């Protein structure tokens, strides 16, 4: 079975455990997902079966949109509710002040990633060190906050939505907002609403071609020649600029890369029929 769809991961289950349940329900062996969600988080998870598991790196999955709630006064080394260490009383805040501070984060956002994260340090994930109480130095990263909007405030909980670039840690964004308000804070809720055009719609099958980030190209060679991996030259292509392209036929497609006037296949014989 070849299928691409968006599932909705519930909270307090790992993305891998959720995929295992999906595989059992659909009775498939070859399956994968893109964009790991933290166990406590919920929301959209892109799932693929069969040949479509090869497509993840060619899909347009950005920007990503999240809805999240900050618990003001709560402190956690993981910046979420799974490792709460202390809770302090926080006086009620002015809603206008909260909105202004949230809105101030639009644009570039530079921060240190959470210690409990998948960032690599010396070839190992940061969370391996954090779980053992070892101190490590993570380098600052810069993300782009494309949009951010206040949703509501029910003291001591602040909910907002944000559209962000690849690799943004919402936990760090929430912590920075809380600090600017003058208090510690951690996430009590995190939901991924969308990844690019990918949104949850009852696991309906998607046409992968509509979600590719590559540009369509056209070739002089026959469908049969491309299917069998015939060598391509730059003169065979309609678009000759460096980049990655997809070539469509009625029942399959290929993905190629053009670099310094050389052409090579990245994928081929990907079925267009999906279930």
Curated annotation (Swiss-Prot):
This is tRNA pseudouridine synthase B. Keywords: Isomerase, tRNA processing. Responsible for synthesis of pseudouridine from uracil-55 in the psi GC loop of transfer RNAs. The lineage of its organism: Bacteria, Pseudomonadati, Campylobacterota, Epsilonproteobacteria, Nautiliales. Belongs to the pseudouridine synthase TruB family. Type 1 subfamily. Its EC number is 5.4.99.25. It is an enzyme of class 5 (isomerase). Gene3D superfamilies: Pseudouridine synthase (3.30.2350.10). The keyword Isomerase applies. GO terms for molecular function: RNA binding; tRNA pseudouridine(55) synthase activity. GO terms for biological process: mRNA pseudouridine synthesis; tRNA pseudouridine synthesis. It catalyses: uridine(55) in tRNA = pseudouridine(55) in tRNA. InterPro entries: PsdUridine_synth_cat_dom_sf, PsdUridine_synth_N, tRNA_psdUridine_synth_TruB. The active site is at residue 38.
